[in-house]
Regions:
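A short beta-strand-loop structural module common to alpha/beta enzyme folds
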Residues: 31-41
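Single conserved hydrophobic/aromatic residue that forms the stacking wall/gate
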Residues: 1-7, 11
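Short N-terminal binding/cap micro-motifs at the start of the first secondary-structure element
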Residues: 12-19, 41-44, 190
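Glycine/small-residue-rich interface belts in oligomeric ring/scaffold proteins
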Residues: 42-66, 75-84
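Active-site cores that bind ATP or allylic diphosphates and position pyrophosphate for catalysis
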Residues: 69-388
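A structural motif
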Residues: 29, 63, 94-95
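Histidine-anchored nucleotide/phosphate-binding helix
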Residues: 15-29, 52-60, 167
Length: 388
């Protein structure tokens, strides 16, 4: 059997929490595929280092095949993020199980919540609409509307939210892939505390920026991976402000996730902000989560317009592979529903999703801590990481 895991974390992409998850998957599966965010991550930040270094860490942690989650899914709200990941695995045609981390740890509880959300009745819909109109963010409105039916932590904890969306995407696509979950091992998604040898992505980024040793919290040594770390989004401060000051409200309306007049607030805030972080603070209000505001701004910078997103991926891109992964890939090539990219030079199709990935990587490279390494077109030059 082939199992898959979501790989949305960005800490050189693997912490001991993920190693624990992989070890659990391997108890039930012969091989592990990871679908990993590329240059930017869902909370609206640049990934901590380049995607090839992170693919290498995934392989070092026990993954057999690393696939990139295109940025049109990675830099998106939970439903679209999950849809992209599930449809990649559906298209691949060789996956039997998907495993994701959750605060709940109960697949029955998550499936029950997902089925309720997927079959939303008009009464619940009206409640959500009313709460949002009252200035509540959509996640908070959802939690309140379902308070009598679904435990509040299912709709408020980030990994639980993604877990229910993965299950909903499986339901919508009539997928044969079976969901499994592994309880988040102590450290939550944004937890800033340390628990023995487990730390969250947020905590590890913070430690890295403070030059603290994180080797005890990851299943490899950073010097063995030889990556430039950490990438810092503040390198893009001027680029972000410049880009927004050159845009019109009409331009911004076409950008992913921009709705309800937020474009006017973003543009006016860009005129009185001097950095990405001050811009986010100036745009912030009760209706939008900070992550969503960050995603909208980055989407504007990389030219991620609404028309680029589609539920079905236009390709599957391999970032890393080992011997077991090669066997999986050989099996998939005969049945996969979309092109599989191993060498980008061989990919001749016109793909707005792929072009967006190239732009995203070009921009993300500017966040490299070493100025001479901020090269462009890495997507067109680099090959997958092969671990023998």
């Amino acid at each position: 059997e082939i199992g898959s895991c979501d790989w949305s974390s960005d800490v050189c992409s693997s912490d001991l929490g993920h190693k624990y998850q992989i070890d659990e998957i391997k108890k039930h599966s012969d091989a592990v595929i990871a679908v990993m965010s590329g240059s930017f991550v869902q909370r609206g930040d640049v990934a901590i280092t380049d995607k090839w270094s992170r693919a290498k860490t995934a392989l070092s942690s026990g993954v057999d095949l690393v696939i990139e989650l295109p940025v049109c899914y990675a830099l998106n709200a939970a439903p679209n993020f999950a849809t992209g990941g599930i449809n990649i695995l559906n298209a691949l045609g060789v996956v039997n199980n998907i495993c994701f981390g959750s605060e709940s740890g109960s697949i029955d509880e998550l499936m029950s919540a997902a089925e309720l959300l997927e079959n939303e009745n008009s009464e619940i819909s009206e409640k959500i609409k009313k709460y949002v109109m009252g200035g509540m963010s959509y996640p908070n409105a959802l939690t309140k509307a379902y308070s009598a039916l679904i435990p509040s932590d299912i709709l408020s904890e980030p990994n639980n939210i993604l877990a229910t969306e993965y299950i909903r995407a499986l339901i919508r696509s009539d997928s044969k892939i079976k969901p499994m979950t592994v309880k988040r091992h102590k450290a939550g998604y944004h937890d800033r505390n340390l628990y023995q040898n487990i730390a969250s992505a947020t905590k590890l980024r913070e430690m890295n920026r403070n030059n603290e040793n994180i080797n005890d919290f990851i299943p490899y040594k950073l010097e063995d991976i030889n990556c430039d770390i950490p990438y810092d989004i503040s390198n893009l401060d001027s680029a972000i402000i410049s880009k927004l000051r050159l845009m019109t409200a009409e331009d911004l309306q076409n950008i992913s996730e921009v709705t309800e007049g937020i474009e006017n607030r973003i543009l006016s805030s860009a005129n009185m902000s001097y950095s990405f972080e001050t811009l986010v603070e100036n745009v912030k209000n009760k209706r939008y989560t900070t992550s969503k505001i960050r995603r909208m701004i980055i989407s504007a910078l990389i030219g991620f317009t609404k028309d680029i997103y589609s539920p079905m991926p236009q390709y599957i891109r391999i970032l890393g592979i080992n011997k077991v992964g090669m066997t999986i890939l050989k099996q998939a090539k005969g049945i996969c529903k979309v092109p599989i990219i191993t060498k980008t030079a061989d990919f001749k199709e016109q793909s707005p999703q792929f072009n967006l990935d190239v732009r995203a990587t070009n921009i993300a490279m500017l966040c490299n801590p070493i100025p001479t390494h901020r090269i462009g077109n890495a997507d067109l030059k680099k090959s997958p990481i092969i671990m023998k």
